[in-house]
């Protein structure tokens, strides 16, 4: 994988391309990309300026979506913009712009993951700084506030649980482990569905995807394989990455949103 190029200094290339684009999509991860990372995930909200930019893009006919590992209802409440695509639980839950929701996980699997969450809670409750988050189809083990010794003990417990329970996979993110069903579902499978639904795989279409974490690499690799015109953007200092472009952080993401909106106004892109 080659090093991604900084996107903002190269924006003029995309501005020229947008003059010939008839369909545009903008999709982004949430934590660490659209908003900064916080020690308390419950304190995160997008700012009013970011919300207005997303609303303005959507009003111009741009397909806009936010994809996250968060529970779908939690994600929707924190972004708070109507008419967007929302993907939660790393692709296991989806809400379309009309507000219709779709779950990509069966009731037995949901029950399995609920039981797993209870098991992890019982085994990790004594470790300070370790927090268990039960989601629809996944279980997250957060260790941002834990000391190194507690992190090592938690990792050992998780490895033992994985050995005891089949048909699970583990994703390591930024100060979090995600345990999920071993099913072919990811942010990329959800985004591929959205791309088809929004006709972004047709000629004269272009879509962007921004992300900062290891889970976003599924999307970046998928974008490299697809034949649709797409711009993959790694946010932050994660290297190596399959993304072709890079932004330094949420501050530059807001600048990009402003550039994109200005280009849409200039070229009347829809």
PLM regions with names:
Residues 70-89, 149-169:
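Substrate-recognition/cap helix-loop segment adjacent to the acidic, metal-dependent catalytic center
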Residues 37, 44-135:
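Active-site phosphate-binding/coordination module
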Residues 17-39, 66, 191:
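Asp-based phosphoryl-transfer active-site loop
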Residues 130-148, 167-180:
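Charged, glycine-interspersed solvent-exposed loop segments at helix/strand-loop junctions
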Residues 5-22, 74-79:
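Short amphipathic alpha-helices and their capping/turn segments at secondary-structure boundaries
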Residues 89, 96-114, 118, 173-203:
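Substrate-recognition "cap/lid" segment bordering the active-site pocket of phosphatases
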Residues 2-9, 21, 188-270:
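Mg2+-dependent phosphoryl-transfer enzymes with acidic/Ser/Thr/Gly-rich catalytic loops
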């Amino acid at each position: 994988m080659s090093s991604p190029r900084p996107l903002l200094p190269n924006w003029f290339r995309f501005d020229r391309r947008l003059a010939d684009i008839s369909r545009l999509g903008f999709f982004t991860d949430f934590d660490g990309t659209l908003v900064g990372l916080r020690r308390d995930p419950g304190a995160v909200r997008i700012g009013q300026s970011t919300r207005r930019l997303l609303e303005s893009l959507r009003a111009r006919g741009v397909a806009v979506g936010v994809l996250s590992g968060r529970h779908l209802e939690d994600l929707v409440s924190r972004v708070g913009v109507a008419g967007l695509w929302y993907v939660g639980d790393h692709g296991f839950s989806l809400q379309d712009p009309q507000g219709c929701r779709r779950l990509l996980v069966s009731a037995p699997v949901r029950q399995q993951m609920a039981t797993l969450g209870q098991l992890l809670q019982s085994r990790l409750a004594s470790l300070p700084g370790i927090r268990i988050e039960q989601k629809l189809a996944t279980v997250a083990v957060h260790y941002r506030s834990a000391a190194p010794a507690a992190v090592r003990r938690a990792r050992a417990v998780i490895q033992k649980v994985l050995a005891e329970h089949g048909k699970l996979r583990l994703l390591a993110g930024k100060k979090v482990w995600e345990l999920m069903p071993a099913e072919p579902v990811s942010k990329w499978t959800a985004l591929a569905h959205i791309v088809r639904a929004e006709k972004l795989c047709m000629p004269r279409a272009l879509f962007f995807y921004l992300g900062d974490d290891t889970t976003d690499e599924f999307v970046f690799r998928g974008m490299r394989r697809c034949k649709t015109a797409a711009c993959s953007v790694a946010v932050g200092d994660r290297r190596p990455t399959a993304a072709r472009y890079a932004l330094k952080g949420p501050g530059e993401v807001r600048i990009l949103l402003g550039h994109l909106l200005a280009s849409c106004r200039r070229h009347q892109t829809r």
